[in-house]
Amino acid sequence: MTIAKMIDHTALKPDTTKEQILTLTKEAREYGFASVCVNPTWVKLSAEQLAGAESVVCTVIGFPLGANTPEVKAFEVKDAIQNGAKEVDMVINIGALKDKDDELVERDIRAVVYAAKGKALVKVIIETCLLTDEEKVRACEIAVKAGTDFVKTSTGFSTGGATAEDIALMRKTVGPNIGVKASGGVRTKEDVEKMIEAGATRIGASAGVAIVSGEKPAKPDNY
């Protein structure tokens, strides 16, 4: 598998414009990225632009704080699927995890998994920069129990992004059959290679073209 096919080509900034989405989807077609990862408002346009392409549309749920109710997250998933999303990246209820309310964390994830079942792949963002190692392990274990397809490090909107150490811990926790996505601060081919070596099977990056081409990102960011 090429590196491009492991990348979710990402544009999640709040000021993203239609022109930028059109560029993003054009680049996804050209380079063969796994997906474009966009905010829900851009799912329909992205799906239209990628009709017939190998790249699919990924969107974000309960993003970036994870503090919506399970019911709201489930509605977001259904709406996104209706608009053409094939993958959804949801943020867990981080406060509930901190409170050791594992039942709520699991119910929250299950609501998304159930809403997406058979229609969209689910990635669970645990926001590693806010968690202890014990919490990272517990979050991954709950996500697997709830039926996720992937666990993911970060939103890119908090205090830190992906590290090889966190990827290795997540991979060790979920085993070989669940995907692990590194996201947040992954900007170069060398960054990607470190993440893959640690156990990542998907990369979230706004610098997808620079990573594949070997050029420096025009404007580095966290996404």
Swiss-Prot record:
GO terms for biological process: 2-deoxyribose 1-phosphate catabolic process; carbohydrate catabolic process; deoxyribonucleotide catabolic process. Pfam families: DeoC. The lineage of its organism: Bacteria, Bacillati, Bacillota, Bacilli, Bacillales. It comes from Listeria monocytogenes serotype 4b (strain F2365). SUPFAM superfamilies: Aldolase. The gene is deoC. InterPro entries: Aldolase_TIM, DeoC, DeoC/FbaB/LacD_aldolase, DeoC_typeI. This is Deoxyribose-phosphate aldolase. It catalyses: 2-deoxy-D-ribose 5-phosphate = D-glyceraldehyde 3-phosphate + acetaldehyde. GO terms for molecular function: deoxyribose-phosphate aldolase activity.
